[in-house]
């Protein structure tokens, strides 16, 4: 059996209980060495085979999985954050389907949740934004035409951008062209939840300058929207005394 396990955003203690158990039981661990906290490998039992996929191709990763399966070993494929976002897991799963090899997924904490925690943010504030757009700036990997930053920016919703720190000048131009005001709040969160985490609040207009000042060129998330400064929002209906729910009756004002 192959277990695709979410490593969490960085901090070792943010892996799930199930994910930790799988790591302890694994005979083989293939981890995304470019981003996964190597402290998680301390859960591996003695004799566990450990592979760093940063140095491997897809074919080489699959080869290890097939060998492990033939030897009746349990394999953990350890991906950063939650691999349902930019995790390149589907291509692995499709090949495993072709080979008739069973697998499952163990979800976890995505780095975009870690970024919110770094700034104590709520992405969905009443009367400010009730939607979160998770996307990336187009680089070497193309983005579908209908999913360009400009088209998403037109919504004015909260936006979380992965894989975009090295393309900030392009990102800023597209955000402004799409309709965001230049003074729209923004933030850069570097290595969210890691010991070396850094978080800086700025505006769209000062994103490039802020990243340059703090020498951040990769491994960061970009947050955009008025929720970043959490001002001018309305109180939630859920805890309003006059709001009736399944569990309590609202009181007349």
Tell me the role of every PLM-derived stretch.
Residues 40-41, 61, 86, 114-115, ...:
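Short secondary-structure boundary/hinge segments and terminal tails
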Residues 20, 42, 67, 124-125, ...:
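Short secondary-structure boundary/capping segments
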Residues 11, 84-155, 198-201:
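Class I SAM-dependent methyltransferase SAM-binding "motif I" and its flanking Rossmann-like core
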Residues 1-109, 114, 208:
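Class I S-adenosyl-L-methionine
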Residues 2, 71-75, 131, 139, ...:
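A contiguous loop/helix-start segment that scaffolds small-molecule binding in enzyme catalytic cores
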Residues 16-17, 34, 126-128, 183, ...:
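Non-catalytic, surface-exposed connector residues within folded enzymatic/regulatory domains
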């Amino acid at each position: 059996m192959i277990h695709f396990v979410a490593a969490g955003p960085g901090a070792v203690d943010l892996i799930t209980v199930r994910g930790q158990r799988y790591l302890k039981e694994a005979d083989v661990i293939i981890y995304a060495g470019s981003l996964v906290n190597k402290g998680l490998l301390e859960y591996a039992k003695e004799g566990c085979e450990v592979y760093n996929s940063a140095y491997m191709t897809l074919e080489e990763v699959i080869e290890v999985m097939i060998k492990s399966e033939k030897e009746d070993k349990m394999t953990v494929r350890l991906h950063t954050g939650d691999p349902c976002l930019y995790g390149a897991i589907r291509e692995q799963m499709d090949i495993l389907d072709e080979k008739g090899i069973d697998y499952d997924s163990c979800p976890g904490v995505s780095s975009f949740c870690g970024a919110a925690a770094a700034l104590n943010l709520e992405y969905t504030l009443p009367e400010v934004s009730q939607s979160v757009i998770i996307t990336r700036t187009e680089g070497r990997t193309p983005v579908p035409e209908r999913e360009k930053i400009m088209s998403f920016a037109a919504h004015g919703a909260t936006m979380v951008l992965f894989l975009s720190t090295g393309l900030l000048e392009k990102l800023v131009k597209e955000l402004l062209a799409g309709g965001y005001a230049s003074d729209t709040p923004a933030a850069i969160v570097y290595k969210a939840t890691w010991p070396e985490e850094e978080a800086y609040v700025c505006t769209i207009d000062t994103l490039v300058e802020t990243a340059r000042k703090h020498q951040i060129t990769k491994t960061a998330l970009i947050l955009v929207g008025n929720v970043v400064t959490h001002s001018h929002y309305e109180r939630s209906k859920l805890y309003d005394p006059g709001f009736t729910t399944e569990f309590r009756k609202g009181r007349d004002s």
